[in-house]
Structure formats: structure tokens, C-alpha cells
UniProtKB/Swiss-Prot annotation:
Transmembrane segments: none
GO cellular component: cytoplasm; male germ cell nucleus; transcription factor TFIIA complex
GO molecular function: general transcription initiation factor activity; RNA polymerase II core promoter sequence-specific DNA binding; RNA polymerase II general transcription initiation factor activity
Main location: cytoplasm
UniProt record, GO biological process: acrosome assembly; DNA-templated transcription initiation; dTTP biosynthetic process; spermatid nucleus differentiation
Key words of the record: Cytoplasm, DNA-binding, Nucleus, Transcription, Transcription regulation
SUPFAM superfamilies named in the record: TATA-box binding protein-like (SSF55945)
Tissue: Present in the brain, heart, liver and gizzard.
Similarity field: Belongs to the TBP family.
Name of this protein: TATA box-binding protein-like 1
Pfam family, one: TBP
Biological role: Part of a specialized transcription system that mediates the transcription of most ribosomal proteins through the 5'-TCT-3' motif which is a core promoter element at these genes. Seems to also mediate the transcription of NF1. Does not bind the TATA box.
Keyword DNA-binding: yes
Length: 183
């Protein structure tokens, strides 16, 4: 088994965070009273709204900014954001769906082997940091992709990046390094 051989690694996307604007002021009290599946957090000045399909939780501010979390793909995130905008339109707001952007993607990938973390950290010192007293994983940052990887000794890798393509590239880029330090 060598690092160059094509190994099919399953990258499971667990969370996609996206943002969009409604281009109108939103009355949070009206959303709280008339909307479905809503939690009004008056002390913070926001409303949480949940959709069942796709399973998304949205944080809505009176300025018209909406953050959606919980989607499992970029397409599902956009679909859920548009459904949310439609729900707000049905409540009587003049919503215009604009400035949609995927801001964060969280994914999990399992390597087919275990990893020696101290050796991995020593070999990749400027990018990797390992504090076993604080956290059981190595934190590895790839600045060019704006991705952060949490590498565990079991071979599980949690990747956070700005989009799905960056997450996939980060896993491809890290594979030869973790392969060198396998148990």
C-alpha cells in the first residue's frame, strides 16, 4: 500500500452554513407570533426558525440578515434558504432573496488506518499543532484553502472549510502526510 494509490475516501458533509439577505426590515415580533416552528430570543434580538425539509435552522435578525445551518450540501442549503425566504414572504414581508453565500462547510472523513499524532506533528510542524493536554486531535491549517483539519489518532479527520471543493482538496492534500505517520 503506497500513498500514490487511489484510495476511495468517503467525505461525509455534516453541516453547511450559509447567509443571505432579504433587503427589507423584518418585524421579529410578527414572525414570532405568526410564523411556524419559531423561537423568539428577544434579549438577543433574533428569531430562530426551523424547517423540517430540508432540515435547517435559521437565525433571523431584524436587519434582514439570515444565517442558515444544518444542511448537508450546498444545493440543500440554497434550497432551504429560498424556502425560508418564501416563508417570510407569506408572512407579509417584501423579501428579495439576495447575497446568498455559503460561508462554512463541516465534513468528516475516516482514514483506513490509525495515525501516530506526535510523529505527524513533528513532520508537519509549521502547519500542525498538537496539545494532548488540551485536545486529543492535531489542528492542521491549510492557509491557501482556508481550511482547518482536526486529525485524531483513530484516523478520523474533521474538516472545516469555506466550501465543499476546498474541503475535498484539503483531504486530498493531507492524505500523503497522514499516510507517512500511519500506525
Amino acid at each position: 500500500m503506497d500513498a500514490d494509490s487511489d484510495v476511495a475516501l468517503d467525505i461525509l458533509i455534516t453541516n453547511v452554513v450559509c447567509v443571505f439577505r432579504t433587503r427589507c426590515h423584518l418585524n421579529l415580533r410578527k414572525i414570532a407570533l405568526e410564523g411556524a416552528n419559531v423561537i423568539y430570543k428577544r434579549d438577543v434580538g433574533k428569531v430562530l426558525m426551523k424547517l423540517r425539509k430540508p432540515r435547517i435552522t435559521a437565525t433571523i435578525w431584524s436587519s434582514g440578515k439570515v444565517i442558515c445551518t444544518g444542511a448537508t450540501s450546498e444545493e440543500e442549503a440554497k434550497f432551504g434558504a429560498r424556502r425560508l425566504a418564501r416563508c417570510l414572504q407569506k408572512l407579509g414581508f417584501q423579501v428579495i432573496f439576495t447575497d446568498f453565500k455559503v460561508v462554512n462547510v463541516l465534513a468528516v472523513c475516516n482514514m483506513p488506518f490509525e495515525i501516530r499524532l506526535p510523529e505527524f506533528t513533528k513532520n508537519n510542524r509549521p502547519h500542525a499543532s498538537y496539545e494532548p493536554e488540551l485536545h486529543p486531535a492535531v489542528c492542521y491549517r491549510i492557509k491557501t484553502l482556508r481550511a482547518t483539519l482536526q486529525i485524531f489518532s483513530t484516523g478520523s479527520i474533521t474538516v472545516t472549510g469555506p466550501n465543499v471543493k476546498a474541503v475535498a482538496s484539503a483531504v486530498e492534500q493531507i492524505y500523503p502526510f497522514v499516510f507517512e505517520s500511519r500506525k
